[in-house]
Amino acid sequence: MVEQTKDQLSAFHYHMLDFLLTKSEKVTFTDSFIWLTSAIQTYFSTLCVSLTPSPSDFVTKLADGEARFSASKINASCYLIEDGSGRRFHLACRQDEEIPEGLPDVVASFLNQSMKQERLYNKTIYQKKIYKMTELFHSLLDQTDVLKQLLESLTSTFSLFEFSLFISHDQDQCLGIPAKELYMEGEKSDSFALKVYLSGDILRKNESVAYIPIKGQQGTYGVLKAEGTGDSFLTDACLDEMSLLANAAGKAFENAQLYEQSKASIANLELINETSRRLNQRLTLTDTMNDLAVRMAESFQAEEVGFFHIDHFENLTLLPGSTAFFKEAKPSDFYNELKEKLYEGEKGVFIGNGQSVFGKAGYGSLMAAPMIQNDRLLGFAVLLKQELYAFTFEMYKLFQALIHHATLAVTNSMLRDRLEHLVKTDQLTELYSRAYLDEKIQYSMKIHQKGVFILVDIDNFKNVNDTYGHQTGDEILIQVASVIKSNIRKHDVGARWGGEELAIYLPNVPVAVGKRITERLVYAVRKNTKPEVTISCGISCWTTETKKSLKELVHEADEALYSAKRSGKNRLMIHDSIK
């Protein structure tokens, strides 16, 4: 009888192995269990051996983890086969018989192998599904479609969980999906979502709730909240799978964003090129500015367009093409503030809420961009709109680019003014002419409270010409002029007075400041000329209390210069009338 049982066990074992090796990968654990019970009854019918699940514990769906079946003896005719997840099976025979030795271990091994095969098959199916989802994500070129597909994929794959999205404000503005905005503070803020957004790491709130970042290569774009319904727990395996999908969607979202940005960049470049082409076809300033105004109004839906030119006296002049709002009133203090900001190096001004500037009934949004040519501020353009926050930052950057490219056309149209300016400049030293200096001084005497005039003479200049030649003399003049330009302010005026004499006018400064600047010049010329030369300087000044004519101002500086020459040169003298 024992030998017969051994033969039955061997035949059963062989049949079981054949089944495991030849069965389709689609055969489930439940199907394998049904085959096993039938085979046991067939091979061990004489012993009435049966394999039955515990009614309340039999689970057809595999649990997470690597729980394995093992057999434990209850008595000679009954064994309990169970795994760590709570699934139990009873292997039993007639009470007057014994379970064949080795059969419980063979059954446990079969169940483990069947469970492993189903797990591998399910994993393969899952990986294919994830691959298809990822492939679908990357086929989408719209940010909204990517996030919608992410929610649909998660909902279909994890039916026992609810999902919600947190999107940053700059992303939420252009997405038409149900998403919560990420608030940095306040009652609406979610500290867990914010922490995940800033760190880019997964964060568990409890056993059934977790926050998962949606991130690409360049940053985090949002946060996914997964929340179990009812008594559902969020296992580590599920969380890893959700994170895998979120990462795939994050990269696809980033690619879609870059694609949309590239399309916008191409459209902007086309707009800039077309604008530049049209503007450069025009010859007159009026035609150029009118065309530019139309393009600004169309591109940004601006209600008011203004163009300002800054002349050599820093006065604001309204250019053609400006709309009625700017024509009806003189430039206000605010426009002068814009000018000063741009003079200080600002690349533009962007105001989303202009009520503090124009009042509650005025314009709500403003953009201003400078017109710069060869590092010189020629003017600026202003766009206005009634609606608050009507201009986006992207529009602002495009506006800056358009004005930057249009400036060349505007500059060409203003060539006459530029040529007039060149006429006012000494060709050799690139300092202003004496006539322009006179004009500047007279203008300053009208609008300022004081001013300093400095007359400069290069000592022994005739000896330089006689010793080194007139070409070297010219080079000395250029070197001294360069020192002057590098030691005075942008609004000060350095001029070629005549021959080896140069002049400087410092508007709206006291004589003490003029003295310090002149001392610096005397030292700098001696150190920065080759061959080395020195200068003598005479200083005069005017104030509203001691009003002087231009002729008197020049005469006093000339007398002070003569005193410096008589006192040994290489020095400065202040006119005796100045105390």
From Swiss-Prot:
Residues 449-577 form the GGDEF domain. CDD domains: GGDEF (cd01949). GO terms for cellular component: plasma membrane. InterPro entries: Diguanylate_Cyclase, GAF-like_dom_sf, GGDEF_dom, Nucleotide_cyclase, Rev_trsase/Diguanyl_cyclase. GO terms for molecular function: diguanylate cyclase activity. SMART domains: GGDEF. It comes from the Bacteria. GO terms for biological process: cell adhesion involved in single-species biofilm formation; negative regulation of bacterial-type flagellum-dependent cell motility. This is Uncharacterized protein YtrP. It comes from Bacillus subtilis (strain 168).
